[in-house]
Amino acid sequence: MIKNPKVLILTAHYGNGHVQVAKTLEQTFRQKGIEDVIVCDLFGESHPFITDITKYLYLKSYTIGKELYRLFYYGVEKIYDKKIASWYANFGRKRLKTLLQVEKPDIVINTFPIIAVPELKKQTGISIPVYNVLTDFCVHKIWIHREVDRYFVATDHVKELMVDIGVPAEQIVETGIPIRSSFELKVNPEIIYTKYQLCKNKKILLIVAGAHGVLGNVKELCQSFMSVPNLQIVVVCGKNEALKQDLLSLQKQNSDALKVFGYVENIDELFRVTSCMITKPGGITLSEAAALQVPVILYKPVPGQENENAMYFERKGAAVVIRDDSEVFAKTEALLQDDVKLLQMKEAMKSIYLPEPAGHIVDAILAENHAEPRHIPIKSPALAQSFT
């Protein structure tokens, strides 16, 4: 029995989702008394210049580079078995070998498709358990490697896709995608209405605009929605200060109809009171929406995993997917007026959600490695005051 295993979690800063999952797992390990946990951005530490370029191209996929990203995502899927695996497997290898030699972890977890560790296992025969935590509602072959001991996935649908491409079913565990613990707490909504100056007798539309130009023509949309009676619009701009300042000038015209925020630490609070949300179809955001049963309108998904995520939620009846700017206002207004449809979407979200994914993943990993967890109780935090 390993009383205090050392855990290495490998991730990457392509969007915030992969890192957020890594941090959630880290916190869950610590809550269970496993304190020796390291989170490492392997690619960023190994090749910072190349990583910065690829991160820039990734962000551009939301605006001008959609076709380029489509070619990359689906092109890699087609040729992965041939050539790209050998190149990708060695990316970050030097830094990884140093990490393994210095830190000597007992367990390695990937929240980004990094195959350097399983490839090293294959080539050198080192014995270290490797776990992949998939962060979308689809699967790309780049996640798959024979030396991965276990895969933790979002849904039975993802499990079926993996079995179809040859992964043994017993290596795949359906747990859901790890989300922040705040999304799984019970909170009195009355406090939230007061905190954000919202009216519980009106419909609330949450727009998560993001910091990278993910959602276009936000100001024009807000102007249109402000004309809808009995509706409050809440826009979260993230770290996009220019967008925030632009919308604050609009808010002055009707501060009851439009509420503008920058970065909101406890964004789960807004999820809890919104009638529906316009956002992008990232795996983590969708998992958080499912946890709180928030109907979503998914705006112009980027080809690749976001499009696959969007199609899955659309098939399940939990999302409306909009691919044309001209449809955003009409389809959103129609949904807000259709209480039956909103309720059906909430029920669909409920059917997708699997509770406490991080806890189940950590428990499974510790059990497989005969580690002894020591639960440390954590108080439910009071409502945070940090929003700008």
UniProtKB/Swiss-Prot annotation:
Pfam families: Glyco_tran_28_C (PF04101), MGDG_synth (PF06925). One of its GO terms (cellular component) is plasma membrane. HAMAP family: Diacylglyc_glucosyltr. It is found in: Cell membrane. Its EC number is 2.4.1.315. It catalyses: a 1,2-diacyl-3-O-(beta-D-glucopyranosyl)-sn-glycerol + UDP-alpha-D-glucose = a 1,2-diacyl-3-O-(beta-D-Glc-(1->6)-beta-D-Glc)-sn-glycerol + UDP + H(+); a 1,2-diacyl-3-O-(beta-D-Glc-(1->6)-beta-D-Glc)-sn-glycerol + UDP-alpha-D-glucose = a 1,2-diacyl-3-O-(beta-D-Glc-(1->6)-beta-D-Glc-(1->6)-beta-D-Glc)-sn-glycerol + UDP + H(+); a 1,2-diacyl-sn-glycerol + UDP-alpha-D-glucose = a 1,2-diacyl-3-O-(beta-D-glucopyranosyl)-sn-glycerol + UDP + H(+). Its main location: membrane. InterPro entries: Diacylglyc_glucosyltr_N, Glyco_trans_28_C, Glycosyltransf_28_UgtP, Pro_diacylglycrl_glcsylTrfase. This is Processive diacylglycerol beta-glucosyltransferase. Processive glucosyltransferase involved in the biosynthesis of both the bilayer- and non-bilayer-forming membrane glucolipids. Is able to successively transfer up to three glucosyl residues to diacylglycerol (DAG), thereby catalyzing the formation of beta-monoglucosyl-DAG (3-O-(beta-D-glucopyranosyl)-1,2-diacyl-sn-glycerol), beta-diglucosyl-DAG (3-O-(beta-D-glucopyranosyl-beta-(1->6)-D-glucopyranosyl)-1,2-diacyl-sn-glycerol) and beta-triglucosyl-DAG (3-O-(beta-D-glucopyranosyl-beta-(1->6)-D-glucopyranosyl-beta-(1->6)-D-glucopyranosyl)-1,2-diacyl-sn-glycerol). It comes from Bacillus cereus (strain B4264). Pathway: Glycolipid metabolism; diglucosyl-diacylglycerol biosynthesis. GO terms for molecular function: 1,2-diacylglycerol 3-glucosyltransferase activity. Disulfide bonds: none annotated. The lineage of its organism: Bacteria, Bacillati, Bacillota, Bacilli, Bacillales.
